[in-house]
Amino acid sequence: MNQKKLRIGLVCPYGWDTPGGVQSHVRDLAEYLIAKGHYVSVLAPVVDEEKAPEYVTSAGKPIAIPYNGAVARLLFGPIAFARVRQWISNGKFDLLHLHEPAIPSISLLACWAAEGPMVGTFHAAAKRQKAIFAIGPILEPVIEKLTARIAVSEAARSTLTEHLETDAVVIPNGIYADRYRDGEVVEKWSGNTIGFIGRYEEPRKGLPVLLEALPIIARFAPDVSVLVAGPGESKEVIESIDPQLRSRFEFLGRISEKEKADFLSSVAIYVAPNTGGESFGIILAEALAGGAAVLASDIPAFDSLLGHGEFGALFKSEDPQDLAHVAIDLLRDGDKRRALAKRGKEYAQRFDWDVVAEDIYSIYEMALVGSSGVTLSSENRAWNRFLGREGS
């Protein structure tokens, strides 16, 4: 990259302390841009400010609310709005990059509070939601303030079009592909091992589908084992497993980025049995880069990311028998599995930050044309109307 050095404000709507795809995307983008010489400040809800990186400014502590089949930790309201305005005022930014600006969050508050070049990235892929339609009259003029819009996938783009009747350029989430290509094979994790990473207590991550498929898989692949990593309480999950199969499971809990790279380089198959609510599937891109053969449910986001089956195998979503059938085929046919993994590893390079960040920066350049930077908006009627303070 040979770029003009910018002052960039990134807004992350979700709690910085909680693992998640959006948080990882914002963190990696911020650190990539900083390494390229740009000034970057991230505004996010933060619980433990002492552990946050120097480039992160806390907008306050998030609260947990149900959203899109999971629990999102967000921040909203007049106190947060004041902090957003202060951050914008202090930042003297050339450009703001707001993530998920269409949900009640500090990203939406920043869009209300600012004038000037603003890029919005839309991550969510969700069914039509009454809550978004209810505040549509407020959202639409705010979203129109965005100079440019990015969607991380066709699924996210479709959600944006359906909810707010606007469009976006598709630029995928980024990964550091080299980190996963350089993973080391851990002998005890290798062999006929199926890997799963995710919040396994969260139903939409689909671990119960894999658990239901395992007895079938074990009949045809007697040496199969399952390696599970991620946050959650494993006791209840273990109790739901057939006692005769429990010895085949190992629960690792949270793992580091290095351990994740080794995990993905070691397992024979990485399985993503998610049942919905996904817009991209960053873990699939990481698994491809790590050299695992990927087997995923055929939800739209995964089907698209895997090239409709060219770079990873697919099974019918929420169908344990189909999952078992495809997994058995891959476990018993090593040549087929290795060929699939090889295609996936080569394909994963398109998600590397060197590619993705270049595409994002090109959007920044477009948004900056004719601009003199970001300023505070003096027009807050939408905010006052939302709070029932019209005329105040």
Regions found by a protein language model. Name each.
Residues 308-309, 313-320, 329-335:
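Conserved acidic donor-binding segment of nucleotide-sugar-dependent glycosyltransferases
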Residues 237-261:
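Nucleotide-activated donor-binding/catalytic signature segment of Leloir-type glycosyltransferases, i.e.
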Residues 46-48, 197, 225-238, 253:
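Glycosyltransferase donor-sugar binding loop
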Residues 186-205, 211-215, 227:
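Conserved donor-binding/catalytic core segment of Leloir-type glycosyltransferases
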Residues 155, 174:
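Carbohydrate-associated surface elements
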